[in-house]
């Protein structure tokens, strides 16, 4: 079933919904970010990963500074319409540390 942006429940978490970013080819989870309605509209319009930066309090496109962009192949919405997956083709590392994925640390036992 296809959903519209207006069906996404942005109000449940104060205007933001989590976005899991996953490599469309390898299926590796690259990162977790957040989107608001405006950044999701930009992602749909441009085909690039757009997010809302909670730390900088502004819109940002992945790769706008690093060049490591993510081309969106598909956007999936969960059953409650309060979480999203971007299936992407990354052009470089997803993590600002230079790692391919942001989930490269293990929690101590």
Predicted regions and their residues:
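C-terminal binding/interaction regions
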Residues: 2-16, 22-30, 35-109
């Amino acid at each position: 079933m296809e959903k519209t942006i207006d069906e996404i429940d942005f109000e449940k978490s104060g205007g933001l919904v989590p976005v899991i970013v996953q490599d469309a080819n390898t299926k590796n989870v690259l990162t977790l970010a957040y989107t608001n309605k405006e950044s999701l509209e930009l992602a749909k319009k441009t085909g690039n990963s757009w997010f809302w930066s909670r730390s900088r309090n502004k819109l940002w496109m992945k790769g706008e500074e690093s060049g490591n962009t993510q081309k969106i192949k598909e956007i999936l919405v969960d059953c409650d319409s309060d979480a999203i997956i971007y299936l992407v083709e990354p052009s470089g590392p997803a993590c600002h540390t230079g790692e391919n994925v942001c989930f490269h640390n293990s929690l101590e036992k």
